[in-house]
Amino acid sequence: MKTQEIEKKVRQQDAQVLAQGYSPAIRAMEIAAIVSFVSLEVALVYRLWGTPYAGTWLLLSAVLLGYLAADFVSGFVHWMGDTWGSTEMPVLGKALIRPFREHHVDEKAITRHDFVETNGNNCLISLPVAIIALCLPMSGPGWVFCASFLGAMIFWVMATNQFHKWSHMDSPPALVGFLQRVHLILPPDHHRIHHTKPYNKYYCITVGWMNKPLTMVHFFPTAERLITWATGLLPRQDDIGAEAARALVVAAGGSEAPVVQAAKELLTQATVQEKPASTRP
């Protein structure tokens, strides 16, 4: 099925209804998440500052690898939010999935969000990792690197939606525009690829460096086919409507990658149990 035919089948939710889903309770939760996140990151920096193992190269490598990891994490979370779940789910639907649905029907809405609404969700999902990083022992270079890497990764994860917001602004600040042009943060033209119906590619939105490698290995399409095969769930049904979602699955069905076939065989073998031998004489 041609892409144009699939685009005609797309049916999205109402932008105003989605925007109204941002409740005072969700905002209070996001404020608490931001305060908690900043407190944990400051505590982690304090611990790292006092260790003799935190060398310059160790910290720089942790920051760079953390940036790449954050880009991948942003893509994975973005893919999960775009592809699975529903706005009607308890708690998660309004707090986490709703913003993904709103963004596809009103992509400029994010430019009207303040700091809390823009960054609160990412602070919230980063809290468990921040606690783990803070609890790691600082008894050697390896542990210090792990703590630094995790701390850097979640810092960039926290900044992801801010970079994402800037990529949708018509006139971002001058320094931001420069960083976008040299592709040190997410550039608007690069992100535009994702905002082409049916919104099924280029999910990484911290900087976008991981988009091409993940596209080359068919990472997200492979994951979708395996999940659909194993569970029967239809990817993007809540985002673009059941008809368009089914059309996408049918269009992709004829080009199944060998790795998907192999994974299906392994899963089948793992789930099929042999019948116990009869003990009757």
UniProtKB/Swiss-Prot annotation:
Which intervals lie on the Cytoplasmic side per UniProt?
1-28, 76-123, 160-281
What result follows from mutating residue 164 to A?
A: Impaired carotenoid synthesis caused by loss of plasmanylethanolamine desaturase activity
The record describes its membrane topology as: Multi-pass membrane protein
GO cellular component terms attached to this protein's record: plasma membrane
Q: What is the effect of changing residue 191 to A?
A: Impaired carotenoid synthesis caused by loss of plasmanylethanolamine desaturase activity
Q: Which residues make up the annotated site Essential for plasmanylethanolamine desaturase activity?
A: 78, 103-104, 113
- Family as reported in the entry's similarity comment: Belongs to the fatty acid desaturase CarF family.
**What name does UniProt use for this protein?**
Plasmanylethanolamine desaturase
Gene giving rise to this polypeptide? carF
